Amino acid sequence: MDVVKKSRNVHGSNDFSELIVSVRRVAKVVKGGRRFSFSVLVVIGDEKGKVGCGIGKHLEVSEAKIKAVNAARKNMIRVHLRESRTLHHDVKAKFCSSKVMLRSAKVGTGIIAGGSIRLIFEVLGVQDVVAKSIGSSNPHNVVYAVFAAFRKMLSPKQVANKRSRKIGDIIENR
C-alpha cells in the first residue's frame, strides 16, 4: 500500500523541509500470526543544495517518520547547483531495476518529473530540471537511483581539474 503524502515541516534549528514519499504497512509473519508495523520513506533538504533520504520502521506512523527523518539527517549529501536553480550537467544512474535520467533545463522550465523524483527536487531547491524514470517505479528504488545520480555528478571545480582548465572556462561555455 504505497501512499504519496506531501507533508512539509520545518524541523528543529537546521531548517530542513521534510516530505513523506511513501508510507507502507508491512507484516512480519510469526508463529501466532502476523505482526503489522509501518515503514516510512522520507526526503529532507534545506532547499539550497543539501538533501537526504531515510527509512524508518515502527508500530506507529508518527514514530516511523521520526526514525526516517533521523536516518535522512545522517544520510545528507551536497548537490552542486548551477545558479542555485538547476543541475550543472546531465546524469544517468541505476539502482536495482530503476533507471533515472536527470537533465539541466533553461530558466522557466520548472520541475518536469514525476512522483518521488519531484519531491526530491522540491526539497533540494531545484527550480528547473527535466527528469525521466525508466523501469521499476518502486519509490524506494527510484529515490536511491536519484541519489546515485547525485553522487555521480561533478562540481565545476572537479570538471576543470579533470580537463586541466580554469573554472571560469568551464562555467562561461554554457
Curated annotation (Swiss-Prot):
Q: Does the keyword Ribosomal protein apply?
A: yes
Q: Where is the S5 DRBM domain?
A: 16-79
Q: Where are the transmembrane segments?
A: none
UniProt keyword annotations, A-Z: Ribonucleoprotein, Ribosomal protein, RNA-binding, rRNA-binding
PROSITE patterns, per database record: S5_DSRBD (PS50881)
Q: Which InterPro entries match?
A: Ribosomal_Su5_D2-typ_SF, Ribosomal_uS5, Ribosomal_uS5_bac-type, Ribosomal_uS5_C, Ribosomal_uS5_N, Ribsml_uS5_D2-typ_fold_subgr
Question: Which protein are we looking at?
Answer: Small ribosomal subunit protein uS5
Q: Which organism is it from?
A: Ehrlichia chaffeensis (strain ATCC CRL-10679 / Arkansas)
